[in-house]
């Protein structure tokens, strides 16, 4: 059953573009995801962390997407973010409880996690991912998933994957999952069509 009070729209903003933070928070999106991962180049990772630590943010509406736990930037993210009142962390390429437990431990078991399902391994690990008490809900990352699977990125190619994410979330008693981003975000008709498709499948929110 849908939670009418749950966030529906999630807006990405690169961590190294602090001039966009306030605009994103004023955009009307329910949540703003400040991204330290794919949206920030390797040479700008430190600048991105510095921008987040120095920003005046409404942490009740901000989610931080950290770098993959296997990357060299993960520990630097933890070091920078641990002293901030971050409430929710998005975990890319989450592939099981070991990965998530590492994040939970690094942040002293005091944050809510949103794991991203971005490869086949993470799809088949959904039962253990969703059973973790610190997991709020999961989010789909269709571009990385299609790359891992070797499939197309269109609705038809990944409908079966989306359905599995929705079904497993319902079975685990978790809130409806968050669907992936619309690549051409400047096309409002495409974004609306994507959102309608996501809703039809049972997703409760979408990344913009």
Language-model features and meaning:
Residues 1-208:
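Expand to "…catalyze enediolate/carbanion chemistry for C-C bond making/breaking, isomerization
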């Amino acid at each position: 059953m849908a939670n009418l009070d749950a966030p529906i729209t999630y807006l990405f903003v690169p961590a190294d573009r602090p001039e966009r933070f306030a605009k994103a928070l004023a955009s009307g999106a329910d949540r703003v995801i400040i991204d330290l991962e794919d949206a920030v180049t390797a040479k700008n990772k430190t600048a991105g962390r510095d921008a987040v630590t120095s920003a005046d943010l409404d942490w009740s509406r901000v989610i931080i997407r950290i770098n993959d736990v296997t990357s060299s930037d993960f520990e630097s993210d933890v070091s920078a973010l641990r002293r901030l009142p971050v409430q929710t962390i998005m975990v890319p390429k989450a592939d099981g409880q070991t990965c998530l437990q590492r994040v939970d431990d690094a942040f002293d078991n005091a944050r809510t996690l949103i794991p991203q399902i971005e490869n086949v391994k993470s799809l088949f690990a959904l039962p253990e991912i969703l059973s973790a008490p610190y997991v709020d809900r999961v989010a789909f990352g269709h571009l990385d998933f299609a790359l891992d699977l070797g499939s197309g990125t269109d609705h038809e190619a990944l409908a079966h994957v989306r359905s599995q994410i929705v079904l497993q979330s319902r079975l685990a008693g978790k809130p409806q999952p968050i669907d992936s981003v619309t690549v051409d975000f400047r096309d409002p008709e495409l974004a609306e069509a994507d959102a309608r498709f996501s809703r039809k499948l049972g997703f409760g929110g979408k990344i913009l």
